[in-house]
UniProtKB/Swiss-Prot annotation:
Subcellular location(s) per record: Cytoplasm
Gene Ontology cellular component list: cytoplasm
Record gene name: sepF
Protein name, UniProt field: Cell division protein SepF
Region (Disordered), start-end ranges: 21-73
InterPro entries: Cell_div_SepF, Cell_div_SepF/SepF-rel, SepF-like_sf
PANTHER family to which the protein is assigned, alphabetical: CELL DIVISION PROTEIN SEPF
Family of the protein in this entry: Belongs to the SepF family.
Keyword terms of this UniProt record: Cell cycle, Cell division, Cytoplasm, Septation
Length: 168
């Protein structure tokens, strides 16, 4: 196996390795007439072993129609929450997942926890294809995708710089 191309092909697993060493030994040794022929078993090489394929589920990049959406029904309930701590976010998430609009009043929370809760609520609404709107400086409305909110939207856009979201 003096050919470099052949060595490369063997290394990459594209060709089988020739057993030159065994051929050289059989040429120099005298034949034994009384001995039974020995069976030679090939040694498996790493390149000859089939690779193990691991499969994992693929997450689609776009919204698929099989995504679990809240059932579209007549809206007959709106939940109003006055959280005092960040751990109250679980009740907000459970109601929003069921398709219930949630009004969050942050006036009783510390500013740090209120920011965390709004970050959580923003992610929740994005993940479930809903939207979040600021009603007053410390009151927010989480509306699921099947709920349409109408009202005045002019003028509120200009207040974004002075809003609760403004980073100092």
């Amino acid at each position: 196996m003096a050919n470099p191309l052949k060595k490369t092909m063997v290394y990459l697993g594209l060709a089988d390795e020739e057993l030159e060493f065994e051929e050289e030994q059989t040429q120099h040794q005298p034949r034994r007439e009384a001995a039974a022929p020995a069976s030679v078993q090939p040694v498996p090489h790493p390149a000859a072993v089939a690779p193990v394929q691991n499969r994992a589920p693929v997450t689609p990049l776009r919204k698929s129609s099989t995504a679990r959406n809240a059932p579209v029904q007549e809206m007959n309930e709106i939940l109003t929450v006055h959280p005092r701590q960040y751990r109250d976010a679980q009740a907000i998430a459970e109601s929003f997942r069921e398709g219930i609009p949630v009004i969050i009043n942050l006036s009783q929370m510390s500013e740090g926890d209120a920011r965390r809760l709004i970050d959580f609520a923003s992610g929740l609404s994005q993940g479930l294809y809903g939207k979040i709107e600021r009603v007053t400086p410390k009151v927010f409305l989480l509306s699921p995708s099947h709920i349409v909110v109408s009202g005045e939207h002019g003028g509120q856009e200009a207040e974004v710089d002075a809003s609760f979201f403004a980073q100092a």
